[in-house]
């Protein structure tokens, strides 16, 4: 998850490749009461990263988000990033498997009576182990139990994991809007590796 906003290329004399993206907005208006997701592995731990260091946050954001074209927070300096993630309304939780960071989620509780799931994802090495639904359930539980809210929402991108939308809907989120956007390909600008490609992300070369 992570909305890749449009940015112009550094060299304005060159033709900038634009990527077309569909941003899908989903919401949950009450806490789910259905069947719980079973714990997929043993030796799991979910810990809140209180006053998370910038270096550790960058590791999580870059490692989890690179395959899915997360790049906005790569563009900002350490002091600006620290100011963002150290706001009292931001909560960051990290999933560990046998002591190794396997994924994270970030909640924004700034708005009254609603919470935004800003970022959510797994380290690539841990994809395919049924950890995604388990971590999402933990994020939902935290959002609904930490304070009184009437809405939990998020948005996902065309370039997110191909199962992302389905997983969100299975967890109880409902689509309420879509928006078409275009943005300069961050691989051309050196923000992400040029070799990065997956469906529907076309190769550069």
Label each PLM-derived region with a short phrase.
Residues 127, 154-164, 181-191:
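Conserved beta-strand-loop-alpha-helix junction that forms the acyl-donor binding cleft
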Residues 91, 150, 174:
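Short acidic/polar active-site loop segments enriched in Thr and Asp
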Residues 143-156:
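Conserved GNAT acetyl-CoA-binding A-motif
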Residues 1-50:
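Acyl-donor-binding surface of acyltransferase catalytic domains
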Residues 38-72, 194:
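Short amphipathic alpha-helix that is part of the acyltransferase structural core
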Residues 122, 128-143, 165-170:
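Conserved acetyl-CoA-binding loop-helix of GNAT-fold acetyltransferases
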Residues 75-79, 85-124:
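A conserved beta-strand-loop-helix scaffold within acyl/acetyltransferase catalytic domains
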Residues 18-21, 182-205:
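Acidic/histidine-enriched, glycine/proline-rich intrinsically disordered or flexible terminal extensions
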């Amino acid at each position: 998850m992570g909305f890749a906003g449009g940015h112009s290329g550094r060299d304005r004399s060159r033709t900038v490749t634009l990527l077309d993206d569909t941003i899908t907005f989903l919401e949950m208006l009450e806490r789910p009461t259905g069947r719980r997701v079973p714990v997929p592995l043993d030796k799991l731990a979910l810990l809140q990263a209180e006053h998370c260091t910038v270096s550790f946050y960058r590791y999580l954001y870059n490692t989890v988000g690179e395959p899915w074209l997360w790049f906005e927070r790569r563009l900002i300096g350490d002091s600006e990033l620290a100011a963002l993630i150290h706001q009292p309304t931001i909560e960051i939780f990290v999933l560990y498997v046998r002591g190794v960071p396997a994924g994270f989620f970030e909640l924004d509780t700034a708005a009254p009576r609603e919470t935004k799931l800003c970022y959510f994802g797994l380290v690539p090495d841990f994809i395919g182990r049924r950890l995604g639904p388990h971590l999402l359930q933990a994020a939902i539980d935290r959002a609904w139990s930490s304070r009184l809210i009437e809405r939990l929402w998020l948005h996902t991108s065309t370039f997110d994991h191909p199962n992302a939308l389905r997983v969100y809907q299975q967890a109880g989120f409902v689509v309420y809007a879509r928006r078409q956007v275009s943005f300069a390909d961050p691989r051309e600008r050196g923000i992400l590796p040029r070799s990065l490609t997956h469906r529907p992300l076309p190769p550069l070369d």
